[in-house]
Amino acid sequence: MASPRTITIMALSVALGLFFVFMGTIKLTPRLSKDAYSEMKRAYKSYVRALPLLKKMGINSILLRKSIGALEVACGIVMTLVPGRPKDVANFFLLLLVLAVLFFHQLVGDPLKRYAHALVFGILLTCRLLIARKPEDRSSEKKALPESAEEQPSLYEKAPQGKVKVS
């Protein structure tokens, strides 16, 4: 049977991957939701207006929206279907992307309810990455503890003669 750690990583990977495939698809095409697509177009126009450096670099709102959407779809597919280290790389890229989106929301002065989902999914991506990168076997770090009180040396045996060790 799979360990709880493995099940947690798999569940987070699939859920996060599907979410980012969905959100990336909304940024790329109006087929899923015309309202959400038009809202994304409006939001990305405000992001480019708020950050003139993007315009100077030749990045318009369409290019920014489609680039972010394509990256979300690609990383979401990797998170959902590809095993091993590529999941961690996709997780890292999505985490950077979420941080950029949070920056954009703060830049244009959006209220918390407009970017709360980005905060939540950023936290979930961070948790998944921390759980996945944590070493599997921690038993080597733990010392074997005596099982009964008879096996444990008393404080009097550990302390020098005539002194009691107080901890």
Swiss-Prot record:
The molecular function terms of the Gene Ontology recorded here are: acetylcholine receptor regulator activity
Concerning PANTHER family, the annotation shows:
NOVEL ACETYLCHOLINE RECEPTOR CHAPERONE, SPINAL CORD EXPRESSION PROTEIN 4
Q: What is this protein called?
A: Novel acetylcholine receptor chaperone
Q: Which residues lie on this side of the membrane: Cytoplasmic?
A: 1-5, 83-88, 133-167
- Which keywords does this chain's UniProt record carry? Chaperone, Cytoplasmic vesicle, Endoplasmic reticulum, Membrane, Peroxisome, Transmembrane, Transmembrane helix
User: Where in the cell does this protein reside?
Assistant: Peroxisome membrane; Cytoplasmic vesicle; Endoplasmic reticulum membrane
- List every stretch annotated Disordered: 135-167
The organism is Mus musculus (Mouse)
Report which residue ranges the record marks as coiled coil.
Answer: none
Give the protein family.
Belongs to the DoxX family.
GO BP of this protein: chaperone-mediated protein complex assembly; positive regulation of protein localization to cell surface
Q: Cellular component per GO?
A: cytoplasmic vesicle; endoplasmic reticulum; endoplasmic reticulum membrane; peroxisomal membrane
Q: In which tissues is it expressed?
A: Brain (at protein level). Expressed in the spinal cord dorsal horn (at protein level).
Q: Which gene encodes it?
A: Tmem35a
Which intervals of the chain are annotated as region Interaction with NGFR? 43-54
Q: Which residues cross the membrane?
A: 6-26, 62-82, 89-109, 115-132
Partners and quaternary state? May interact with NGFR. Interacts with RPN1, RPN2 and CANX.
What the record says about disrupting the gene is: Mice show a complete disruption of the assembly and function of the neuronal acetylcholine receptor (nAChR) subunit alpha-7 (CHRNA7) in the brain. Exhibit enhanced locomotor activity, profound abnormalities in spatial/working memory and a significant reduction of assembled nAChRs in the brain. Display thermal hyperalgesia and mechanical allodynia accompanied by an increased number of microglia in the spinal cord dorsal horn. Exhibit elevated basal serum corticosterone accompanied by increased anxiety-like behavior and an impairment of long-term memory.
What InterPro entries does this protein map onto?
TMEM35A/B
Point to the regions of Basic and acidic residues compositional bias: 135-145
Q: What's the protein's topology in the membrane?
A: Multi-pass membrane protein
Kindly report the protein's main subcellular placement as a broad class: membrane
What residue ranges lie in the Lumenal compartment?
27-61, 110-114
Its biological purpose is as follows: Molecular chaperone which mediates the proper assembly and functional expression of the nicotinic acetylcholine receptors (nAChRs) throughout the brain. Essential for the proper folding, assembly, function and surface trafficking of alpha-7 (CHRNA7), alpha-4-beta-2, alpha-3-beta-2 and alpha-3-beta-4 receptors. Stably associates with ribophorin-1 (RPN1) and ribophorin-2 (RPN2) (components of the oligosaccharyl transferase (OST) complex) and with calnexin (CANX), both of which are critical for NACHO-mediated effects on CHRNA7 assembly and function.
